[in-house]
Amino acid sequence: MLSKREFLKAVVGLTTLVGTHSSLAKEAAQFPMKRTAIVYYSHSGNTRTVASRISALTAAPVFEIVPQTPYPNAYRPTTKQVREEMQKGYLPPIHAPSINLNDFDVLIIGTPTWWHHIARPVASWLSQTDLSGKVIMPFNTHGGGGLMQTRDDFVQMCPKSTVTQSLTVYGNGDSDLDEQILRWLKEANP
């Protein structure tokens, strides 16, 4: 059963969606991004939500990076573990997404921001994946820190790729998430 707060959020979201659906559908139709894929890692679900919205607006397929050993669910133990991994330069083993990179020219890559940087599972995938010649459209989700060093991390880890400007989303996005995404697609689309 939904709590009163969850119910109200759903009603407000539905009202907003119905009110803006036709104009968003028109704008989204401008972005059928051929040869584009979305690759992301999500710990809490925020980055997954944004990746799903981008996919809905672009019709791009979605591929998830999954760590072989999941991070703790609780915030503090996760931040402690991530900090230790970063200090040691440790990249966790992952279950890489089954994506044929030859099928795509543009990769929309999503990550939560962890200690000002891209998440370690994303860093693992980037370190073992040749993205030469690809266009990287990064996006990050955060809990208050904003973009931080995430775009710089993509530039550093993808030196033979073109990295566009980033989409930065607080949490899993506000009620205007679709508008934020469409604005970003217009500004960053190669």
Regions found by a protein language model. Name each.
Residues M1-T15:
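N-terminal secretory signal peptides and thylakoid transit peptides that target proteins
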Residues L2, A29-P70, K80-P190:
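FMN-binding flavodoxin-like domain, especially the glycine-rich phosphate-binding loop
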Residues R76-T78:
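Hydrolase active-site cap/lid region
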Residues A25-E27:
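Boundary at the C-terminal end of the N-terminal hydrophobic targeting segment
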Residues P72-A74:
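Short Asp/Glu-rich motifs
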